[in-house]
């Protein structure tokens, strides 16, 4: 069953002319949620404004999801998105450049791909993660309004496995989280079986592990209904 979370969005501007409806995001990563395969199950999700991919899904899977949901998609690459798995295909648009900023349904998003792509193997690099974070920070991101952050690897100490090197979050991302305080940070990479909860709170930021799929409803200030899981 696809998980669901409601998040308050501090800027009322994107909700004008929506007649009280939330902005609905389908966030996916790492493995294809079986719910998305069956048309009847997809119908139960309801309309989606846009899709966010947080890495380690093939472009074929991403293209299928975007076509089946009938919504625009923005996504970044994970550590497994290399070689034949990442061959060019016409079924899906190109991945977002790391540290690129997008605008979807009136909401700003910034993505952070796995910071070690470019060769036959995706190596883990704290130095490159810091480089990503600093590039976004120098753009004065967040000064003109709130932003959704989406990455493959979570920030250090927020949805990660800090005792294991491979699934430990990046300290540069944690610095960026504390600097920007985005309302929402979406990520994958961390196996759901290894964590006690798929969502956490870091200051003003809701951090969500979207492995599989999560529907995120963004609500204007002071209008979030009770959250269902």
Which residues make up each language-model segment?
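N-terminal active-site segment of His-dependent metallophosphoesterases
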Residues: 1-66, 142-145
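Binuclear metal-dependent phosphoesterase catalytic core
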Residues: 2-22, 88, 101-108, 125, ...
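A generic local structural motif
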Residues: 11-14, 36-42, 59-63, 96-97, ...
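Conserved beta-strand segments of alpha/beta enzyme cores
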Residues: 24, 72-74, 95, 108, ...
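Active-site neighborhood of phospho(di)ester-bond hydrolases with catalytic His/Asp-centered motifs
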Residues: 27-30, 50-56, 74-79, 148-152, ...
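Conserved catalytic scaffold of divalent metal-dependent phosphoesterases
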Residues: 28-35, 77-168
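Active-site environment of divalent metal-dependent phosphoester hydrolases
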Residues: 32-36, 57-63, 79-86, 117-121, ...
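A short, gly/pro- and small-residue-rich
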Residues: 69-79, 168-173
